[in-house]
């Protein structure tokens, strides 16, 4: 019985983290959204299905953790791309950053 409660708590935390990540990614995400309703339906359906049919007891929890990892990684990638977008610096700018000065080019 204690292990079932522990599994429920971990599954709940995973779902809570997924919801948190979805809120960060999609500002319109709310309990009224289709994504939220689908997530809750799957969680409720899984409680019954896992006990009856699943070969691996925590298979759906593993899938949920994988999905959480995917959402989190995608969000972090987007944040990094947004932060560092803008292209590369010119040779002159890069040299100036490290305190170097390029020799002057003679005009022909």
Curated annotation (Swiss-Prot):
GO (cellular component) term, any one: mitochondrion
InterPro entries: FMC1_homologue
Family the UniProt entry places it in: Belongs to the FMC1 family.
Full protein name: Protein FMC1 homolog
UniProt organism field: Caenorhabditis elegans
Lineage start: Eukaryota, Metazoa, Ecdysozoa, Nematoda, Chromadorea
């Amino acid at each position: 019985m204690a292990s079932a409660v522990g599994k429920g708590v971990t599954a709940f935390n995973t779902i809570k983290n997924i919801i948190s990540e979805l809120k960060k990614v999609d500002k319109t995400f709310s309990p009224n959204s289709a994504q939220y309703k689908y997530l809750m339906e799957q969680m409720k359906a899984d409680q019954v299905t896992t006990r009856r049919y699943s070969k691996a007891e925590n298979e759906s929890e593993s899938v949920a953790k994988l999905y959480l990892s995917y959402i989190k990684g995608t969000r972090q990638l987007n944040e990094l791309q947004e932060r560092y977008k803008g292209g590369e610096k010119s040779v002159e700018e890069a040299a100036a950053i490290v305190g170097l000065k390029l020799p002057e080019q003679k005009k022909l």
